[in-house]
């Protein structure tokens, strides 16, 4: 019986696919056919590519027989992506310690339910004592979340909350109402912490519509209570609806259940809002790829890009919610993995990357629990549009609003501290053109996974 099998080999090393058919001995290791491929495709270095079958990288020491190839098999050859540059930035990863933060800024922490409840009870008891001893001056002292109390710190490279306070006291009818609302909220939060149950912000509002009057009021009170207690909002067991998803080479426990993110299909695994329920993270990935849009995420998931280049892929489907940001930070802290960002080449894509990187003003008191200050901007860079020959019909003229946002962004301290960001934004403004990630699919829907990302990562072409 013949040991020969027929291999249809697709060359994905270039932007244009080429194919060839080879007859090989099923008992010969794959490495033995590299010389033939070298001759067929004129590949200069035989160690410059890898074999893939069913989207997974193959061990070249094994034979087709060991790999259970059919008599007629289709395999791909792709660039062997060097992770040398990724390894280099991994050595340079930095997480600020307590001593790195400026004196007086508000830094909150994730705390378990019992410790958060203890702080809440102590704060409530202190307020009761105040009302008994000096009722006219009894007040809740809450760190102010006003814009003038928020600033960018160049040392930690984060947006932080200062130590200015606002006073909620029995001094007018309006302040009496706000104190009553805070007291009611504290009672509701105490009940759920005691049972270690989670609720949404909307649930909290509907627990007492008459006193809160509007959900925006209860939402703000929740943030005020968290910062007053020195804990994250998640520590109050109050969560918001989430939209983030993850796929790739990571598994973890969620409420005790084992989650394997390589088996989540194209749709990925929804990121739970209950980040405190995620434990025992394990991964053989080399980096995290944060993607702006779900469409790009689905392309990466369907092509199983993480099997080709070992990574974890996450999207917040646009502007990320708290849970997505906290999940990215959790991976960064627990697994010590570099994070690369893939966004649209426009001011709003950069604004999303900025939120992942330095935090947002609205949640400045939680920046340390959500921001990853050393994220690298992998793409889509404005300079990539010419470098990767994105045609003019796939580029979009910037609107006056786009230009104004870009001009404002270039003046920000965060951007000024990153010269390459300045260069890329200036290039965008000078050409007056922007582009979406989907522009990479102008000729081939797999161009991003087969060519663009492998070459960007291989060469370390990030900002």
Put a short name on every predicted segment:
Residues 87-340, 347-463:
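Nucleic-acid enzyme cleavage-core boundary/entry regions
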Residues 53, 67, 205-206, 341-343:
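Broad hydrophobic/π-residue packing in well-ordered secondary structure
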Residues 1-91:
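Ubiquitin system architectures
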């Amino acid at each position: 019986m013949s040991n020969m099998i027929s291999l249809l080999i697709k060359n994905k090393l270039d932007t244009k696919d080429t194919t060839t058919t080879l007859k090989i001995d099923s008992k010969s290791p794959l490495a033995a056919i590299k010389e033939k491929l070298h001759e067929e495709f004129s590949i200069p270095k035989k160690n410059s590519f890898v074999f893939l079958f069913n989207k997974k990288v193959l061990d070249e020491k094994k034979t087709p027989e060991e790999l259970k190839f059919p008599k007629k098999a289709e395999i791909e050859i792709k660039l062997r992506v060097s992770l040398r540059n990724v390894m280099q930035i991994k050595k340079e990863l930095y997480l600020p310690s307590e001593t790195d933060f400026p004196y007086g800024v508000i830094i909150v922490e994730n705390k378990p339910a019992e410790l958060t409840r203890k702080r809440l009870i102590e704060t409530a008891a202190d307020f009761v004592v105040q009302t008994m001893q000096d009722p006219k001056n009894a007040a809740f002292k809450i760190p102010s979340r006003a814009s003038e109390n928020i600033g960018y710190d160049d040392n930690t490279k984060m947006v932080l909350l200062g130590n200015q306070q606002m006073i909620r006291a029995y001094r007018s009818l309006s302040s009496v109402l706000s104190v009553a609302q805070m007291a009611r909220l504290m009672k509701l939060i105490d009940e759920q912490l005691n049972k270690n149950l989670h609720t949404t912000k909307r649930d909290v509002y509907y627990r007492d519509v008459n006193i809160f009057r509007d959900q925006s009021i209860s939402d703000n009170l929740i943030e005020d209570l968290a910062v007053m207690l020195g804990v994250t909002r998640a520590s109050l067991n109050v969560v918001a609806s989430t939209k983030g998803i993850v796929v790739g080479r990571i598994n973890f426990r969620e409420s005790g259940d084992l989650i394997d993110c390589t088996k989540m299909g194209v749709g990925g695994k929804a990121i739970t809002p209950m980040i405190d329920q995620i434990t025992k993270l394990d991964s053989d990935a080399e980096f995290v790829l944060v993607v702006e849009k779900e469409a790009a995420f689905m392309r990466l998931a369907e092509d199983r890009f993480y099997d080709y280049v070992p990574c974890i892929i996450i999207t917040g489907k646009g502007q990320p919610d708290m849970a997505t940001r906290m999940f990215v930070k959790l991976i960064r802290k627990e697994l010590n993995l570099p994070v690369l960002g893939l966004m649209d080449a426009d001011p709003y894509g950069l604004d999303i990357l900025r939120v992942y990187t330095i935090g947002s003003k609205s949640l400045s008191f939680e920046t340390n629990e959500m921001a990853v200050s050393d994220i690298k901007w992998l793409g889509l860079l404005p300079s990539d549009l010419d470098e990767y020959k994105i045609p003019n019909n796939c580029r979009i003229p910037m609107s006056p609003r786009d230009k104004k946002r870009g001009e404002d962004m270039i003046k920000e301290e965060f951007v000024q501290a990153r010269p390459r960001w300045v260069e890329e934004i200036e290039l965008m403004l000078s050409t007056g053109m922007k582009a979406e990630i989907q522009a990479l699919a102008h000729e081939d829907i797999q161009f991003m996974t087969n060519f663009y990302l492998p070459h960007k990562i291989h060469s370390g072409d990030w900002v």
